[in-house]
């Protein structure tokens, strides 16, 4: 019989069949009873006969692309000049004041200056596409920009959960706005959400290392032999 912490590990069993059954029930319900799922899985426009003389007033992408579509629409000339430019300047100052290596400072300042110059020289449509692509690619930088000394959220400061919670809410709001027709208030919210989305990742090297972390038990640490 295992003892102490090891016994707890054996008690915490994962029932794979239960999880698979729940997934198959939900999957089958959608496939057989609601394949269009309110127009989000299969868009209503796909069921309308094509009319070459008439363009639909509003075209929205599939639901899993809508957050990034909101980023695309949020990038306007005003957003680049009055939102992103001040943010990038403050970001460069933060790097200059905290980075240890001179090469990091030089690369950051050069990149910020190049981006700001590009905002003035290239139209916003181009930067909208760049922003949409960057919103996807920035997810792959997580292993390098997360400077937390522990991996599990269980041992991180409590306010880190609030940061992740705000990010999830922002992502869902961007997804909702992506399926709605554009209007002034929605565009403003999308701009705020876009700025918060990128700030979450760009500031992660700092905020992920802040706070009081709990000590990690020996049973969950790996020591190479």
Per-region residue spans from a language model:
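Alpha-helical transmembrane segments and their helix-start/interface "positive-inside/aromatic belt" motifs
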Residues: 11-26, 105-110, 156-164
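Alpha-helical transmembrane segments
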Residues: 97-101, 141-157, 179-184
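Hydrophobic membrane-spanning alpha-helices of multi-pass integral membrane proteins
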Residues: 57, 61-62, 84-95, 106-115, ...
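Hydrophobic alpha-helical membrane-insertion segments
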Residues: 21-47, 170
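Membrane-interfacial catalytic/cofactor-binding modules of polytopic membrane enzymes
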Residues: 37-82, 117-121, 125, 129
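Small-residue-rich transmembrane alpha-helices that serve as helix-helix interface/gating elements
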Residues: 189-201
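Single conserved hydrophobic/aromatic residue that forms the stacking wall/gate
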Residues: 1-6, 10
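Membrane-interface capping segments at transmembrane-helix boundaries
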Residues: 145-148, 205-219
């Amino acid at each position: 019989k295992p003892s102490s912490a090891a016994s707890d590990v054996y008690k915490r069993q994962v029932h794979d069949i239960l999880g698979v059954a729940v997934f198959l029930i939900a999957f089958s319900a959608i496939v057989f009873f609601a394949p269009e799922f309110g127009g989000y899985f299969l868009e209503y426009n796909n069921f309308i006969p094509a009319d070459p003389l008439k363009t639909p007033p509003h075209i929205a992408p599939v639901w899993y692309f809508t957050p990034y579509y909101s980023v695309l629409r949020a990038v306007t000339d005003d957003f680049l000049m009055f939102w992103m430019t001040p943010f990038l300047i403050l970001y460069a100052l933060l790097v200059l004041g905290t980075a240890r290596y001179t090469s990091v400072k030089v690369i950051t300042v050069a990149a910020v200056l190049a981006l700001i110059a590009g905002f003035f020289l290239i139209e916003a449509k181009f930067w909208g596409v760049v922003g949409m692509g960057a919103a996807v690619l920035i997810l792959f930088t997580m292993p390098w920009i997360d400077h937390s000394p522990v991996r599990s959220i269980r041992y991180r400061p409590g306010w880190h959960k609030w940061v992740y919670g705000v990010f999830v809410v922002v992502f869902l709001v961007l997804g909702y706005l992506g399926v709605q027709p554009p209007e002034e208030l929605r565009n403003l919210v999308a701009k705020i959400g876009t700025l918060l989305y990128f700030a979450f990742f760009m500031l992660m090297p700092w905020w992920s290392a802040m706070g009081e972390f709990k000590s990690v038990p020996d049973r969950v640490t790996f020591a190479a032999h």
